[in-house]
Amino acid sequence: MIKGVLCAILVILCLSPLLAQEKIDLFGYYEAQYMGAKVKSNTYQLFTNKLRLDLKGQIADNITLAANINVLTYHGKTNWDVLEFLSDDIVSSIPEELRSLYVIPFENDIVLDNAYVRFRFKPFDLTVGKQQVSLGTGYVWNPTDVFNIKDPLDPTYEQPGHNALRGDVPLGSFHTATVLYSPEDNWRYSTKLLQFKGRMAHFDYYLIGVVRDWVFTDFTRFDAESMSFEATRERRQMLGASTAGELLGLGVWAEYAYNWMELSDDFYELVAGADYTFDFQTFVMVEYYRNTLGKSDYREYDLNDWMRYYAAEQKAISRDQLYAFAQHPVTDLLNLGLINITSFSDGSFAFVPTLFYSLSDNVEIYGYLNINFGKEGKAYSKSQGNGALIRVRVYF
């Protein structure tokens, strides 16, 4: 941890001549976050400190340099036992001597989240390094995004950077072609992406093809020699499309992707959504999500389904879900909202009241309560407990 802080200071010192010449801007934020959970008869708390430091500037006429470092510390309950959130029949199937392995740790860390250089040439732009790769038009779920998985309770939170070589080629005024290569240990499992963006009438759209490796962990099989769960690595090929625009006064979007798997069953994902703002400023949004990797009968949910979901190896555990959100500006500074997430597959749902308060131009407060409704074993079951989150962010 100390070594990481010293490295961050060294980077800033090395860039200080550019900072002095105002070629590089230094900015960021500090974030304090409290997360609490009531699970069965237990109450847990986790407090997080996060400092994000950003550097960005144009160091030449056609060259932009950008990077950010995140420093994180965790306090309180820093090891969460996943088995406390699962149904008794799943927990009872796990040997007693292995139950201590199903823990998600929160460890202090310093992360080089993004670090890239962008070259702007006349025929194309070239971006090299760890960069944002955000795909899709969906608000909560993105079938065509093979890089990121959003938290349904906090879908707008920033995503990590990904190491890649990316080229963007303008094809006239309304079209762009993008090629991306993200190297792994060999060519076969490295990510190759080709995307074509365009605009037609009131709609933006894109077509995309991706080849990428996918690791599925088998959380029922533990390898004592490597001290880890066994995992299967396979090749994933995806073709997809996405569109967003305006129709009859509504903002609408749709996204689809079909995945051909090397070893597992093929599957597809589909998103369709719409939003609208009334004259009295209330904003409403709905988004439907179908993922055939998920299951339509909650009695078929198994340990791997739950663990892969918690470990962000897959986007959903149930096949069909609906996200609904309404928000109203109570004052110029305060917005109150309500989220409802429903699993059509098993009938469970969650209510999530939200609050966003702008204390000043550079200070904001966000919070929510998470209340689950559903019988044990379902996607949003009461046995998973209820939770709360409060986040204060100060920009500089």
Predicted features and spans:
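Outer-membrane beta-barrel pore domains and translocons
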Residues: 29-35, 70-72, 131-133, 182-184, ...
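Residues that define the transmembrane beta-barrel architecture of outer-membrane proteins
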Residues: 45-49, 108-113, 159-163, 188-192, ...
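Outer-membrane beta-barrel "beta-signal"
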Residues: 324-328, 357, 363-364, 368-371, ...
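Residue-level signature of outer-membrane beta-barrel architecture
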Residues: 55-61, 118-121, 169-171, 197-200, ...
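Outer membrane beta-barrel
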Residues: 56-176, 198, 374
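Signature for the C-terminal beta-barrel architecture of outer-membrane proteins
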Residues: 122-123, 149-299
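Transmembrane beta-strands of outer-membrane beta-barrel proteins
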Residues: 24-30, 65-67, 126, 176-179, ...
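Outer-membrane beta-barrel translocator domains and adjoining extracellular loop/strand segments
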Residues: 38-43, 78-83, 139-145, 189-193, ...
